[in-house]
Regions:
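Glycine-centered structural positions embedded in regular secondary structure
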Residues: 40-47, 236-245
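Long, glycine/tryptophan/cysteine-rich extracytoplasmic
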Residues: 1-39, 156-232, 277-303, 310, ...
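Short charge-dense sequence patches
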Residues: 107-109, 191, 234
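Hydrophobic alpha-helical membrane-insertion segments
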Residues: 127-139, 175-194, 258-272
Length: 354
Protein backbone atom coordinates (compact mmCIF):
# COMPACT_ATOMS: atom_id res chain seq x y z
CA UNK A 1 0.00 0.00 0.00
CA UNK A 2 1.13 3.62 -0.38
CA UNK A 3 1.39 3.92 3.40
CA UNK A 4 3.70 0.91 3.58
CA UNK A 5 5.82 2.31 0.76
CA UNK A 6 6.06 5.65 2.55
CA UNK A 7 7.06 3.93 5.80
CA UNK A 8 9.72 1.91 3.98
CA UNK A 9 11.05 5.08 2.36
CA UNK A 10 11.31 6.79 5.74
CA UNK A 11 13.20 3.84 7.21
CA UNK A 12 15.57 3.75 4.24
CA UNK A 13 16.21 7.48 4.56
CA UNK A 14 17.18 7.08 8.21
CA UNK A 15 19.55 4.28 7.17
CA UNK A 16 21.19 6.57 4.59
CA UNK A 17 21.91 9.28 7.18
CA UNK A 18 23.29 6.74 9.65
CA UNK A 19 20.26 6.30 11.88
CA UNK A 20 18.98 3.25 13.73
CA UNK A 21 15.84 1.20 13.13
CA UNK A 22 14.27 -1.10 15.71
CA UNK A 23 12.30 -4.24 14.82
CA UNK A 24 11.09 -6.72 17.44
CA UNK A 25 13.29 -5.06 20.04
CA UNK A 26 16.48 -5.47 17.97
CA UNK A 27 18.38 -2.42 16.70
CA UNK A 28 19.72 -2.27 13.14
CA UNK A 29 22.12 0.27 11.67
CA UNK A 30 23.38 -0.19 8.12
CA UNK A 31 24.54 2.78 6.02
CA UNK A 32 24.41 2.49 2.19
CA UNK A 33 27.53 4.62 1.87
CA UNK A 34 27.44 5.03 -1.90
CA UNK A 35 24.07 6.76 -1.61
CA UNK A 36 25.55 9.05 1.04
CA UNK A 37 28.36 9.99 -1.36
CA UNK A 38 25.72 10.69 -4.02
CA UNK A 39 23.86 13.02 -1.61
CA UNK A 40 27.06 14.95 -0.87
CA UNK A 41 27.65 15.44 -4.59
CA UNK A 42 24.00 16.42 -5.09
CA UNK A 43 24.24 19.08 -2.37
CA UNK A 44 27.43 20.37 -3.97
CA UNK A 45 25.70 20.55 -7.37
CA UNK A 46 22.56 22.28 -6.09
CA UNK A 47 24.61 24.90 -4.27
CA UNK A 48 25.84 26.17 -7.63
CA UNK A 49 22.59 28.15 -7.78
CA UNK A 50 23.89 30.30 -4.87
CA UNK A 51 26.94 31.52 -6.80
CA UNK A 52 25.77 35.14 -6.66
CA UNK A 53 25.50 35.09 -2.87
CA UNK A 54 28.26 35.16 -0.22
CA UNK A 55 30.10 31.88 0.18
CA UNK A 56 28.97 31.57 3.80
CA UNK A 57 25.35 31.32 2.63
CA UNK A 58 26.10 27.76 1.50
CA UNK A 59 26.14 26.74 5.17
CA UNK A 60 22.38 27.34 5.33
CA UNK A 61 22.10 24.01 3.54
CA UNK A 62 22.91 22.33 6.85
CA UNK A 63 19.81 23.37 8.86
CA UNK A 64 17.62 23.01 5.77
CA UNK A 65 18.79 19.47 5.12
CA UNK A 66 18.61 18.56 8.82
CA UNK A 67 15.03 19.79 9.29
CA UNK A 68 13.91 18.08 6.08
CA UNK A 69 15.56 14.84 7.19
CA UNK A 70 13.85 15.00 10.58
CA UNK A 71 10.50 15.62 8.93
CA UNK A 72 10.85 12.78 6.42
CA UNK A 73 12.00 10.22 8.96
CA UNK A 74 9.70 11.33 11.76
CA UNK A 75 6.56 11.59 9.66
CA UNK A 76 6.94 8.44 7.57
CA UNK A 77 9.33 5.97 9.21
CA UNK A 78 7.67 3.04 10.93
CA UNK A 79 10.68 1.33 12.55
CA UNK A 80 13.30 4.07 12.47
CA UNK A 81 14.31 6.35 15.31
CA UNK A 82 14.39 9.71 13.55
CA UNK A 83 16.75 11.44 16.01
CA UNK A 84 19.52 8.85 15.54
CA UNK A 85 20.22 10.15 12.03
CA UNK A 86 21.05 13.66 13.25
CA UNK A 87 24.82 13.31 12.88
CA UNK A 88 24.62 12.07 9.30
CA UNK A 89 22.00 14.69 8.41
CA UNK A 90 24.48 17.34 9.56
CA UNK A 91 27.62 15.87 8.00
CA UNK A 92 26.20 15.30 4.50
CA UNK A 93 25.22 18.95 3.79
CA UNK A 94 28.19 20.27 5.78
CA UNK A 95 30.69 18.38 3.62
CA UNK A 96 28.88 19.45 0.45
CA UNK A 97 28.73 23.11 1.49
CA UNK A 98 32.39 23.23 2.60
CA UNK A 99 33.36 21.61 -0.70
CA UNK A 100 31.39 24.25 -2.61
CA UNK A 101 32.77 27.15 -0.54
CA UNK A 102 36.35 25.94 -0.95
CA UNK A 103 36.04 25.45 -4.70
CA UNK A 104 34.41 28.86 -5.17
CA UNK A 105 37.15 30.45 -3.04
CA UNK A 106 39.79 29.09 -5.39
CA UNK A 107 37.95 30.44 -8.45
CA UNK A 108 37.33 33.89 -6.93
CA UNK A 109 40.11 36.22 -8.10
CA UNK A 110 38.97 38.95 -5.68
CA UNK A 111 39.17 36.72 -2.61
CA UNK A 112 42.05 37.43 -0.21
CA UNK A 113 45.02 35.21 -0.88
CA UNK A 114 45.29 32.12 1.29
CA UNK A 115 48.61 31.19 2.84
CA UNK A 116 50.33 28.74 0.52
CA UNK A 117 50.94 26.24 3.29
CA UNK A 118 47.21 26.23 4.14
CA UNK A 119 46.07 25.53 0.59
CA UNK A 120 48.93 23.06 0.20
CA UNK A 121 47.89 21.29 3.40
CA UNK A 122 44.36 20.77 2.16
CA UNK A 123 45.59 19.59 -1.24
CA UNK A 124 48.17 17.28 0.31
CA UNK A 125 45.54 15.82 2.66
CA UNK A 126 43.21 15.31 -0.28
CA UNK A 127 45.99 13.60 -2.23
CA UNK A 128 46.70 11.16 0.60
CA UNK A 129 42.99 10.42 1.00
CA UNK A 130 42.55 9.88 -2.73
CA UNK A 131 45.52 7.50 -2.89
CA UNK A 132 44.12 5.54 0.06
CA UNK A 133 40.67 5.27 -1.51
CA UNK A 134 42.04 4.17 -4.89
CA UNK A 135 44.34 1.57 -3.31
CA UNK A 136 41.43 0.31 -1.20
CA UNK A 137 39.26 0.02 -4.31
CA UNK A 138 41.95 -2.08 -5.99
CA UNK A 139 42.27 -4.27 -2.88
CA UNK A 140 38.49 -4.73 -2.70
CA UNK A 141 38.40 -5.66 -6.39
CA UNK A 142 41.16 -8.23 -5.90
CA UNK A 143 39.26 -9.70 -2.93
CA UNK A 144 36.08 -9.85 -5.03
CA UNK A 145 37.84 -11.73 -7.82
CA UNK A 146 39.53 -14.11 -5.37
CA UNK A 147 36.32 -14.83 -3.48
CA UNK A 148 33.93 -14.86 -6.42
CA UNK A 149 33.15 -18.54 -6.02
CA UNK A 150 32.16 -18.20 -2.36
CA UNK A 151 30.15 -15.05 -3.07
CA UNK A 152 28.27 -16.83 -5.87
CA UNK A 153 27.52 -19.73 -3.55
CA UNK A 154 26.02 -17.41 -0.93
CA UNK A 155 24.02 -15.66 -3.65
CA UNK A 156 22.51 -18.99 -4.71
CA UNK A 157 21.52 -19.72 -1.11
CA UNK A 158 19.41 -16.56 -1.09
CA UNK A 159 17.09 -18.24 -3.61
CA UNK A 160 16.78 -15.47 -6.19
CA UNK A 161 14.03 -16.81 -8.46
CA UNK A 162 13.90 -14.05 -11.06
CA UNK A 163 16.04 -11.46 -12.76
CA UNK A 164 14.45 -8.73 -10.65
CA UNK A 165 15.47 -10.56 -7.48
CA UNK A 166 19.05 -10.77 -8.72
CA UNK A 167 19.08 -7.09 -9.70
CA UNK A 168 17.72 -6.15 -6.28
CA UNK A 169 20.32 -8.23 -4.41
CA UNK A 170 23.27 -7.08 -6.54
CA UNK A 171 22.12 -3.45 -6.63
CA UNK A 172 21.71 -3.38 -2.88
CA UNK A 173 25.29 -4.56 -2.41
CA UNK A 174 26.64 -2.02 -4.90
CA UNK A 175 25.38 0.70 -2.55
CA UNK A 176 27.91 -0.57 -0.02
CA UNK A 177 30.95 -0.29 -2.30
CA UNK A 178 32.63 2.42 -0.16
CA UNK A 179 31.95 0.24 2.89
CA UNK A 180 33.78 -2.71 1.37
CA UNK A 181 36.65 -0.42 0.38
CA UNK A 182 36.90 0.80 3.98
CA UNK A 183 36.99 -2.81 5.20
CA UNK A 184 39.79 -3.53 2.72
CA UNK A 185 41.76 -0.49 3.94
CA UNK A 186 41.30 -1.56 7.55
CA UNK A 187 42.50 -5.06 6.66
CA UNK A 188 45.74 -4.16 4.92
CA UNK A 189 46.50 -1.51 7.52
CA UNK A 190 46.83 -4.36 10.02
CA UNK A 191 43.93 -3.26 12.23
CA UNK A 192 41.43 -5.62 10.60
CA UNK A 193 37.64 -5.61 10.66
CA UNK A 194 34.90 -7.53 12.44
CA UNK A 195 32.33 -9.76 10.74
CA UNK A 196 30.85 -10.36 14.20
CA UNK A 197 31.66 -9.30 17.73
CA UNK A 198 33.81 -12.43 18.15
CA UNK A 199 35.26 -12.70 14.64
CA UNK A 200 38.21 -10.47 13.71
CA UNK A 201 39.78 -10.63 10.25
CA UNK A 202 43.25 -9.13 9.81
CA UNK A 203 46.54 -10.03 8.09
CA UNK A 204 47.46 -12.12 11.15
CA UNK A 205 44.03 -13.38 12.30
CA UNK A 206 41.24 -15.23 10.49
CA UNK A 207 37.83 -15.27 12.13
CA UNK A 208 36.33 -18.74 12.43
CA UNK A 209 32.71 -17.93 13.26
CA UNK A 210 29.80 -18.07 10.79
CA UNK A 211 29.11 -15.01 8.65
CA UNK A 212 25.75 -13.47 7.71
CA UNK A 213 24.31 -14.65 4.36
CA UNK A 214 25.57 -11.66 2.40
CA UNK A 215 27.34 -12.49 -0.88
CA UNK A 216 29.94 -9.75 -0.46
CA UNK A 217 31.10 -11.32 2.79
CA UNK A 218 32.18 -14.32 0.74
CA UNK A 219 35.15 -12.21 -0.35
CA UNK A 220 36.52 -12.03 3.21
CA UNK A 221 40.09 -13.45 3.23
CA UNK A 222 40.29 -17.04 4.45
CA UNK A 223 44.03 -16.94 5.11
CA UNK A 224 46.35 -14.76 7.19
CA UNK A 225 49.33 -13.75 5.01
CA UNK A 226 51.15 -11.99 7.84
CA UNK A 227 52.21 -8.50 8.82
CA UNK A 228 54.19 -7.95 5.62
CA UNK A 229 50.93 -6.63 4.13
CA UNK A 230 51.32 -3.38 6.08
CA UNK A 231 54.28 -2.49 3.87
CA UNK A 232 51.75 -1.68 1.13
CA UNK A 233 50.31 1.40 2.88
CA UNK A 234 53.80 2.38 4.06
CA UNK A 235 55.02 2.41 0.45
CA UNK A 236 51.96 4.45 -0.52
CA UNK A 237 52.75 6.93 2.24
CA UNK A 238 56.36 7.29 1.09
CA UNK A 239 55.17 7.77 -2.49
CA UNK A 240 52.76 10.48 -1.34
CA UNK A 241 55.63 12.11 0.54
CA UNK A 242 57.87 12.11 -2.53
CA UNK A 243 55.07 13.62 -4.64
CA UNK A 244 54.33 16.22 -1.98
CA UNK A 245 58.01 17.14 -1.72
CA UNK A 246 58.02 17.89 -5.43
CA UNK A 247 54.62 19.56 -5.84
CA UNK A 248 53.97 21.21 -2.47
CA UNK A 249 57.47 22.31 -1.49
CA UNK A 250 57.61 25.38 0.80
CA UNK A 251 60.65 27.63 1.17
CA UNK A 252 60.44 27.79 4.96
CA UNK A 253 60.83 24.62 7.00
CA UNK A 254 58.24 25.88 9.51
CA UNK A 255 55.65 26.31 6.74
CA UNK A 256 56.51 22.86 5.43
CA UNK A 257 55.93 21.40 8.90
CA UNK A 258 52.63 23.25 9.37
CA UNK A 259 51.50 22.09 5.94
CA UNK A 260 52.22 18.47 6.84
CA UNK A 261 50.35 18.75 10.15
CA UNK A 262 47.31 20.27 8.42
CA UNK A 263 47.39 17.56 5.75
CA UNK A 264 47.49 14.90 8.46
CA UNK A 265 44.48 16.47 10.20
CA UNK A 266 42.54 16.47 6.92
CA UNK A 267 43.53 12.86 6.24
CA UNK A 268 42.62 11.63 9.73
CA UNK A 269 39.25 13.42 9.60
CA UNK A 270 38.35 11.86 6.26
CA UNK A 271 39.51 8.38 7.23
CA UNK A 272 37.75 8.46 10.62
CA UNK A 273 34.46 9.51 8.99
CA UNK A 274 34.90 6.87 6.29
CA UNK A 275 35.58 4.10 8.80
CA UNK A 276 32.65 5.17 10.98
CA UNK A 277 30.28 5.06 8.02
CA UNK A 278 31.49 1.52 7.26
CA UNK A 279 30.45 0.14 10.66
CA UNK A 280 27.07 -1.54 11.04
CA UNK A 281 24.80 -3.41 13.39
CA UNK A 282 22.69 -6.15 11.84
CA UNK A 283 21.14 -7.70 14.91
CA UNK A 284 21.89 -8.59 18.49
CA UNK A 285 24.64 -10.54 20.26
CA UNK A 286 27.22 -11.53 17.57
CA UNK A 287 25.91 -9.18 14.90
CA UNK A 288 25.67 -6.16 17.18
CA UNK A 289 28.86 -4.79 15.62
CA UNK A 290 30.42 -5.33 12.21
CA UNK A 291 33.06 -3.42 10.33
CA UNK A 292 36.41 -1.77 11.06
CA UNK A 293 37.56 -0.71 14.50
CA UNK A 294 37.37 3.02 13.84
CA UNK A 295 40.00 4.33 16.25
CA UNK A 296 42.55 1.60 15.61
CA UNK A 297 42.13 1.66 11.83
CA UNK A 298 42.45 5.45 11.71
CA UNK A 299 45.57 5.37 13.90
CA UNK A 300 47.23 2.64 11.82
CA UNK A 301 46.53 4.41 8.53
CA UNK A 302 47.85 7.67 9.99
CA UNK A 303 51.11 6.02 11.04
CA UNK A 304 51.50 4.10 7.77
CA UNK A 305 50.42 6.73 5.23
CA UNK A 306 50.11 10.23 6.68
CA UNK A 307 53.23 10.13 8.86
CA UNK A 308 55.64 9.05 6.06
CA UNK A 309 53.98 11.51 3.69
CA UNK A 310 54.61 14.26 6.24
CA UNK A 311 58.18 13.25 7.14
CA UNK A 312 59.60 12.75 3.63
CA UNK A 313 59.22 16.43 2.60
CA UNK A 314 60.72 17.50 5.93
CA UNK A 315 63.70 15.16 5.66
CA UNK A 316 64.42 16.17 2.06
CA UNK A 317 63.87 19.91 2.64
CA UNK A 318 66.89 22.07 1.67
CA UNK A 319 67.00 23.60 5.16
CA UNK A 320 67.11 20.16 6.75
CA UNK A 321 69.84 19.01 4.38
CA UNK A 322 71.84 22.17 5.11
CA UNK A 323 71.51 21.64 8.87
CA UNK A 324 72.59 18.03 8.48
CA UNK A 325 75.56 19.14 6.38
CA UNK A 326 76.57 21.73 8.97
CA UNK A 327 76.29 19.18 11.77
CA UNK A 328 78.35 16.68 9.80
CA UNK A 329 80.99 19.33 9.09
CA UNK A 330 81.10 20.31 12.76
CA UNK A 331 81.55 16.67 13.76
CA UNK A 332 84.38 16.26 11.25
CA UNK A 333 86.07 19.43 12.49
CA UNK A 334 85.84 18.32 16.10
CA UNK A 335 87.21 14.90 15.14
CA UNK A 336 90.18 16.45 13.35
CA UNK A 337 90.85 18.74 16.32
CA UNK A 338 90.79 15.78 18.70
CA UNK A 339 93.22 13.88 16.47
CA UNK A 340 95.59 16.87 16.38
CA UNK A 341 95.47 17.26 20.16
CA UNK A 342 96.10 13.55 20.56
CA UNK A 343 99.08 13.69 18.18
CA UNK A 344 100.50 16.70 20.00
CA UNK A 345 100.17 14.95 23.35
CA UNK A 346 101.94 11.89 22.00
CA UNK A 347 104.76 14.02 20.63
CA UNK A 348 105.19 15.80 23.98
CA UNK A 349 105.25 12.48 25.82
CA UNK A 350 107.85 11.16 23.39
CA UNK A 351 109.97 14.31 23.85
CA UNK A 352 109.75 14.01 27.64
CA UNK A 353 110.73 10.35 27.56
CA UNK A 354 113.76 11.10 25.40
Amino acid sequence: TPRDALALGGDLWVAVVGGTSVADGVSYRVIPTLFGVFLVMLVRLLLRTTTGFPRSSALFAVPGFLLTSWFLSGASGSHSQWWTGTLGAILIPLIGSIWFAASSYVRDSEAPSMQHWISGGFKMGGLMSLVTVVASAVAALVALVAGWGRASGIHELLGASSMMDTIFIVGGQVLFAPTMMAWAAAWWSGAGFMTATDSLHSPTVVGTGPIPPIPLLGTVPETAPGNWVVFVPVVLGIACGVASARVYRRSHLLHQSAQGVLASVVFVSIVALWMWSATMSMGSVRLAFMGPLVGRSTLYLFVEIALPAMLVPLVTHPTTLALVGQSAGRVRSEGEAMRRRHAERLSREAATAS
